[in-house]
Curated annotation (Swiss-Prot):
HAMAP family: Thymidylate_kinase
The protein, known as: Probable thymidylate kinase
Coiled coil location: none
Pfam families with a match to the protein in the record: Thymidylate_kin (PF02223)
Gene3D superfamilies given in the database record: P-loop containing nucleotide triphosphate hydrolases
InterPro entries: P-loop_NTPase, Thymidylate_kin-like_dom, Thymidylate_kinase
One GO term describing the cellular component: cytoplasm
Native organism: Methanosarcina mazei (strain ATCC BAA-159 / DSM 3647 / Goe1 / Go1 / JCM 11833 / OCM 88)
Family affiliation: Belongs to the thymidylate kinase family.
Keywords attached to this entry: ATP-binding, Kinase, Nucleotide biosynthesis, Nucleotide-binding, Transferase
GO biological process terms, semicolon-separated: dTDP biosynthetic process; dTTP biosynthetic process; dUDP biosynthetic process
Top-level division of the source organism's lineage: Archaea
Length: 206
């Protein structure tokens, strides 16, 4: 039986990575032995290229192809084999981040960049079975990012507002897959809600 793919999405500063760690540490979820991963990948040739691009002024189209190459490698080496072996996979960021973020960075290049980026993935990506969208006002998110230290080029209010709008468009188009979480709520409350829903989903399919 094929495993299921669960993804966590949201703008920078939404708190999703913190929740991802809590999910990984949760003993009730650990019982089911899911595979935990992230995008961009860490410690890989493609993932390192993406991280370097984020920290530089790489051309937006070149940047998209680096992200997409990392996604393809991630699918081939980890996600697809794990799912084929019946493992459930939980990923901190996945393809929806690319649609939402590069759907903004490429606005000057294409009439409908979000759809164009999605079309690049048609036929070969794996669509998640469940996606949590950590929704939050960009002002709050940027304030959180500032507390972490130096900001990246993606952590600007106007930019993140456009990314947030793209995420909400994606969620509205696929309500059966997306669970929108109010990430402005206290961190502990958000963690408990998401962990509860992840556990219920895994128990239901096991």
């Amino acid at each position: 039986m094929r495993g299921k793919l669960i993804t966590l999405e949201g703008i920078d500063g939404s708190g999703k990575s913190t929740v991802a760690k809590k999910i990984q540490e949760n003993p009730e979820i650990q019982v089911f032995d899911p595979v935990f991963t992230r995008e961009p990948t860490r410690g890989t040739l493609t993932g390192t290229a993406v991280e370097n691009a984020i920290q530089s002024e790489t051309d937006q189209l070149a940047e998209l192809f680096l992200f997409t190459a990392d996604h393809a490698e991630h699918l081939a080496k980890l996600v697809k084999p794990a799912l084929a072996n019946g493992k459930n996979v939980i990923s901190d960021r996945y393809s929806d981040s690319r649609y939402a973020y590069q759907g903004v960075t490429l606005k000057s290049r294409f009439e409908n960049p979000l759809e164009w980026v999605r079309s690049l993935h048609s036929g070969w990506t794996v669509v998640p079975d469940l996606t949590f969208l950590f929704d939050i006002e960009p002002e709050i998110a940027v304030e959180r990012c500032g507390k972490r230290g130096e900001q990246t080029k993606f952590e600007k209010i106007e930019f993140l507002q456009n990314v947030r709008e793209n995420f909400l468009i994606l969620a509205a188009e696929d309500p059966g897959r997306f669970v929108v979480i109010d990430a402005s709520r206290p961190q502990e409350e958000v963690e408990k809600k998401v962990i509860k829903k992840v556990l219920e989903f895994i128990q239901r399919i096991s």
